[in-house]
C-alpha cells in the first residue's frame, strides 16, 4: 500500500500517538501527495464524526429532561471529554500525521502532549467511573438509590480529571530525558523509564484491571438475579400445584333459613383436587349446579373460575392450569436466557471495544522506551495503533448512548426539530 504510506528514507522520526509519540519509526518529512490526500480525508472524516457524535450526546442530555439523571451525567461528562479530544487534540495530531513532522514549535508541542495525555486519560477513567456506578447500582440497588446523587457524580468526574492532571503535568515540570527535545521535527512524550511506567499504569493498566473486576462482578450479580427470578417463579408454580386444602362444608342456606338454596362442598374441592384451595357447589331447586373454585397463589390475587358442572359429579381437575404454568415457566426461562445473553453481549461490546482500541497502543508505549535501540516500529503500523486509540472517542458515544432507547428518542426529537426549522 505505497500510496497510503510516507515515502521511506534515511531519517528517523517518532511515530505520533495519543500520548505524543510511541517511539522511533523510519520515515522522512517528505511524503507522497497521495498519502497526504487520502490520510487527510480519512482522519478528517473520523474527527468530524467524533465531534458530531459527542456533541449530539451532550445536546440530548441538555435538552431532554428524562435523560437528566446521575447515570447519564457520567455519560454526558464522558461525551464532553471525548469532544475535547476531538476538538483540541485530534486536529494537531492529524496535521502531524499528514505532514509526518512537527511544524508548530516546541511550546505548542508541550501543550499538545499535555492536552493529549490529560484528555485521553480522563476519557479512560470516565469509563471506570461509569463501571463503578453500574456496579453499585446492581449490587446495592436499595441503598444506592439514596447515595446516587449529582454530588457523587461530580466527585467521580472531578477524580477522573485530577488523576489526568497528575499524569499529564510531570513532563512539563522536568520529568523527561534530554533526548525528548533533541529533534525539532518530532513531538515526543517523555521517554523516562520511571514516567513511562507511572503514566501507562495510571492511565490504562490499573483502570483496565478495575474495569475487568467490576464488569465481571456486574455480570455475576446480573446472572444471579435473573436465575433467582426464574427459580422463584418455578417455586410458585410448584407450590400452587401441591398446596391444596379441603374446602369448608357449610350446611346452612344462603339466607340462613331452611328450604333456601344451599352451598355444599363439591367432591372436586377435596385435597386430591389439584390447584384448588376452596371449592363449593351452589345447587338450586331444579338440580342444576355451578362450581366456583378459588385458586390461591403465593403473592397473587384470587382467581374466581366458574365451571358448569353436572349435579352428581363435579370434578376439580383443571389440567389446563398445570399446562399454563409449565408454559409460563418455560417462557420465563427463555426470557432469562435472552436477558443473560444480552448482558454478556453488552459487557462484551464495552470491554472488547475498550481493549481493542487501547491495549495495542499501551503495550507499545510501555515496551518501546525500554528497547529503543533494538525495537523497530513500522510507520504504517504505528499510525494504525495510534489512531485506533483515538477512535475510542468516536466509539464511546455509540456504545454508551446510541444503543440506549431513551437517547435514540432524544436524537429523533433533535433531528425533527432541525427539519421543522428548515421548512
UniProtKB/Swiss-Prot annotation:
The keyword Iron belongs to this UniProt entry's keyword annotation: no
Activity control: G-protein coupled receptor activity is regulated by lipids: phosphatidylinositol 4-phosphate increases HTR1A-mediated activity.
Binding site for 1D-myo-inositol 4-phosphate: 345-346, 352, 403-405
Motif (NPxxY motif): 396-400
Disulfide bonds: 109-187
Motif DRY motif boundaries: 133-135
GO molecular function: G protein-coupled serotonin receptor activity; neurotransmitter receptor activity; serotonin binding
Any matching Pfam family: 7tm_1
Its biological purpose: G-protein coupled receptor for 5-hydroxytryptamine (serotonin). Also functions as a receptor for various drugs and psychoactive substances. Ligand binding causes a conformation change that triggers signaling via guanine nucleotide-binding proteins (G proteins) and modulates the activity of downstream effectors, such as adenylate cyclase.
Family: Belongs to the G-protein coupled receptor 1 family. 5-hydroxytryptamine receptor subfamily. HTR1A sub-subfamily.
Subunit record text: Heterodimer; heterodimerizes with GPER1. Interacts with YIF1B. Interacts with GPR39 and GALR1.
Protein name: 5-hydroxytryptamine receptor 1A
Protein species of origin: Canis lupus familiaris
Gene: HTR1A
